[in-house]
Design a protein with these regions (language model features):
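Bacterial N-terminal signal peptides that target proteins for export
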Residues: 1-9
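A ubiquitous, low-specificity "background" feature that marks scattered single residues
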Residues: 9-10, 74
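Intrinsically disordered, low-complexity repeat segments enriched in small/polar residues
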Residues: 6-7, 14, 49
């Protein structure tokens, strides 16, 4: 086997291995009403080794960012975060009212039971970059949602 073929094979193997480094579960996007221009995507992320979520892309919105919500002087604030640490073996939950993927300037409404494709971009502790494509269903409440989560993204 030629040296070039070995390099290509190793690169393909490394990319596949890197893609499998983060398990995504319970992923969903909050459905929108007519005229609504923003919504959230939620999921649980579990990395096999220390990794960071460094970006999100989608065709459904002009802007896709990781956001966090936190209390500052009795006011709940939402802000973009440049990356999200995913410690090895620990599940990081992106959920309403907390960490989440914010989809802004939606190109069209996202009714219940429609599909949204997201691409998550990761970088592990060794600097290896990977991405993972997700096909998410839209719903009003995600798996295991309770009444406290209702409307958490209705005012963006």
């Amino acid at each position: 086997m030629s040296k070039k073929a070995l390099v290509l094979l190793w690169t393909a193997f490394a990319a596949c291995a890197a893609m499998a480094q983060v398990e995504v579960t319970d992923a969903w996007v909050r459905a929108t009403a007519q005229g609504q221009k923003a919504t959230g995507a939620f999921m649980n992320l579990t990395a096999k080794k220390n990794t960071r979520l460094v970006g999100v892309k989608t065709e459904a919105a002009a802007v896709a960012e990781v956001h966090e919500m936190k209390m500052e002087k009795d006011v709940m604030r939402m802000q973009r975060i440049p990356s999200l640490e995913l410690p090895a073996g620990k599940t990081v939950s992106l959920k309403p009212g907390s960490l989440h993927v914010m989809l802004m300037n939606l190109k069209e409404p996202l009714p219940v039971d429609s599909h949204v494709q997201l691409t998550l971009m990761f970088e592990d502790a060794d600097g290896v970059k990977s991405q993972q494509d997700l096909h998410l269903m839209t719903t009003l409440k995600g798996p295991g949602a309770d009444s406290k989560a209702d409307g958490a993204h209705q005012h963006h």
